[in-house]
Swiss-Prot record:
The gene is rplD. Part of the 50S ribosomal subunit. NCBIfam families: rplD_bact. Residues 46-100 are annotated as: Disordered. It comes from Corynebacterium efficiens (strain DSM 44549 / YS-314 / AJ 12310 / JCM 11189 / NBRC 100395). This is Large ribosomal subunit protein uL4. InterPro entries: Ribosomal_uL4, Ribosomal_uL4-like, Ribosomal_uL4_dom_sf. One of its GO terms (biological process) is translation. One of its GO terms (molecular function) is rRNA binding.
Amino acid sequence: MTNLTLDVQTAEGTTNGSVDLPAEIFDREVSVALLHQVVNAQLAAARQGTHSTKTRAEVRGGGRKPFRQKGTGRARQGSIRAPHFTGGGISHGPKPRDYAQRTPKKMIKAALYGALSDRARNERIHVISELVPGQAPSTKSAKAFIERLTERKSVLLVIGREDINAQKSANNLPGVHILAADQLNTYDVLNSDDIVFSVEALHTFINRATGAAQEEQN
């Protein structure tokens, strides 16, 4: 594993130094099976699980036998709320449930690092000093800058939580998804063609990742 070095791009079209991407985060082996498991678990946990149907015991009415047992020539019936009646209860229908799956933190971290490594190897990670020059938000400037970085349509923009200027500038751009460094996850990385980090967000993410690794070793 080797550290990767990326130039820091500016909104003016120049470079402002470079940053190193640690190999333990951005040059890891990719396990497709692990990515699949973690993404499925993340999507499952996002489900509300509030779906609910009524059984024959919960549907209003149907307490009286609709007609006598014998002598009508019809099949015997005990309630008009049985599942085979229109307006009857639902048999084996969905009930509220929790879809969350237990996924170990080490697996979640390994999947995220694998997804980032895949994007880094394919030169789909970019680092910028700031999205928009100056103090005023500008969607036009943000759009032009991102289009200069990549021609692909789906972009994940990772910025600092306090970078309100960048948030307002990119909030309405189609194909651009905004996350803070501590919100970075496997699904959003894989769902985007390119990842654009601000220098601040990149350092925050790396510090959190390396700090957590040191705590685990201790």
